[in-house]
UniProtKB/Swiss-Prot annotation:
Keywords: Glycosyltransferase, Magnesium, Pyrimidine biosynthesis, Transferase. It comes from Helicobacter pylori (strain ATCC 700392 / 26695) (Campylobacter pylori). Its cofactor is Mg(2+). CDD domains: PRTases_typeI (cd06223). Belongs to the purine/pyrimidine phosphoribosyltransferase family. PyrE subfamily. One of its GO terms (molecular function) is orotate phosphoribosyltransferase activity. It comes from the Bacteria. It is an enzyme of class 2 (transferase). This is Orotate phosphoribosyltransferase.
Length: 201
């Protein structure tokens, strides 16, 4: 399955000057919501991702996503894996588990995002779950921006990666684009970074 083509066909691979939720600036932005607005395509992508996870023979009892960007991807992945789905959300800028969601002690959970950049949001989600007694067994995403190391990829983890090295990250593709710290972003010389989606917008 050509993941890059899926994003291009959905007009979800945007070019410009963007502020990512990780804080980095980039000339490309992956707008997964545009891909996931097609339920059939969302199902196909989730089935592809589930296949990778099932081949790893992991015992997963639940999928959890940080709101809002990860919710559709996480729900479809949970459906493909045949497990329940929950999500965390920000309250006063702090990640929390709400809406009556509960986790059991030692419940094995995969944290799923639509896109993994540094993995910061995924780790905030994981921390909430671990504090409630859950066991994080893996991370998942439709796409990995190449900072974190994913299973079945030759790319190594880069500076800024937040995901733990002892847990696998499953994703359908690596999208490696230039990313810059705001203090050294060459794009800022000619334009102002915009934030087309995700945290805070």
């Amino acid at each position: 399955m050509d993941i890059k083509a899926c994003y291009q066909n959905a007009k979800a691979l945007l070019e410009g000057h963007f502020l990512l939720s990780s804080g980095f600036h980039s000339n490309y932005y992956l707008q997964s919501a545009k891909v996931l607005e097609d339920p059939k395509l969302a199902e196909q992508l989730a089935l592809e991702l589930a296949k990778q996870i099932q081949e790893a023979h992991l015992n997963i009892e639940c999928v959890c996503s940080p709101a809002i960007g990860g919710i559709l991807a996480g729900y479809e992945l949970a459906r493909a894996l045949g497990v329940r789905f929950i999500f965390t959300e920000r309250v006063d800028n702090t990640m929390a588990l709400r809406r009556g969601f509960e986790v059991k002690k030692n419940e094995k959970i995969l944290v799923c995002e639509d896109i993994i950049t540094t993995g910061k949001s995924a780790m905030e989600c994981a921390k909430v779950l671990e504090e409630k007694g859950a066991q994080i067994v893996a991370f998942g995403a439709l796409a990995n921006r190449g900072i974190c190391k994913r299973a079945h990829s030759h790319l190594k983890a880069q500076e800024g990666a937040c995901l733990p090295s002892h847990l696998p990250l499953f994703a359908l593709e690596d999208f490696v684009f230039d990313m810059h710290k705001p203090s050294s972003c060459p794009l800022c010389a000619t334009s102002v970074a915009i934030k087309p989606g995700s945290r805070g917008n």
